């Protein structure tokens, strides 16, 4: 469940609460979770432990990854919260320890989804207050993953970087695409050969909401069939695309359902 947090999808991370009032607030969310469980569906939600916005009520520039020159590390992608900064793993763990138990108390159970944490490289931080090597960042992120497993029953995220695999139950996609290389005769699915049967996954982004040809690739690569509602949310231009393809699903109206 994406966008349930305050101000919706990527609106205020790492701030989560209050539950977005325009969607019914906490009362509406608890009702949704209860209804899903009565229908025998497992329902989990989307949180974030790697990004931070200055509009968040918990914003503190000291929590941001510091570069060698002391400046703050900025993420090139801006979402609905505006300019996004990279959150250092040490304060991220502290915040997760405070917030994720509150999220679990709402009633979510299953493979809790933390955005992008398994599909981005661990970053070094040069802050005087919380210096971290990239290796320490990976170890700290795994602590957050283990916390998710203990609270919700499992952990999932967006990708399948090796450092995350010991704690990863499901990666939404292994890579962004399967693009042919003119220097290669064939593509060998090495990741799947190594981790198949250990981590559930999809081959690449467009095998989520797959077309007929992509669905064959899901089968070939031993993927987990996955369908993502309202995945085409990007205002497209030459540099911004809907990375999960052009297939989409909706359930807002009776006709959609």
Give the ranges of each region predicted by the language model.
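Aromatic-lined carbohydrate-binding/catalytic grooves of carbohydrate-active enzymes
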Residues: 1-97, 105-113, 118-130
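Active-site-proximal substrate-binding groove within the catalytic cores of carbohydrate-active enzymes
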Residues: 69, 87-112, 117-257
């Amino acid at each position: 469940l994406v966008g349930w947090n305050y101000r919706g999808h990527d609106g205020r991370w790492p701030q989560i609460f209050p539950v977005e009032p325009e969607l019914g607030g906490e009362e509406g969310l608890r009702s949704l979770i209860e209804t899903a469980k009565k229908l025998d569906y497992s329902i989990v939600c989307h949180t974030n432990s790697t990004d931070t916005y200055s509009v968040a009520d918990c914003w503190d520039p000291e929590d941001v990854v510091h570069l060698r020159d002391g400046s703050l590390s900025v993420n090139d992608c801006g979402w609905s919260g505006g300019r996004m900064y990279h959150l250092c793993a040490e304060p991220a763990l502290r915040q997760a320890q405070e917030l994720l138990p509150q999220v679990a108390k709402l009633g979510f159970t299953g493979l809790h989804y933390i955005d992008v944490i398994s599909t981005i490289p661990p970053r070094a931080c040069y802050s005087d207050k919380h210096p971290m090597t990239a290796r320490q960042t990976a170890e700290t992120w795994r602590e957050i993953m283990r916390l998710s497993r203990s609270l919700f029953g499992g952990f999932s995220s967006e990708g399948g970087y090796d450092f995350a695999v010991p704690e990863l139950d499901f990666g939404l996609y292994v890579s962004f695409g399967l693009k042919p290389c003119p220097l290669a005769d064939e593509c060998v699915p090495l990741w799947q050969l190594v981790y198949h049967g250990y981590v559930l996954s999809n081959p690449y982004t467009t095998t989520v909401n797959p077309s007929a040809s992509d669905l064959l690739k899901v089968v070939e690569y031993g993927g987990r069939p996955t369908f993502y509602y309202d995945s085409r949310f990007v205002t497209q231009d030459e540099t911004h695309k809907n990375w999960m393809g052009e297939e989409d699903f909706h359930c807002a109206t009776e006709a959609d359902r």
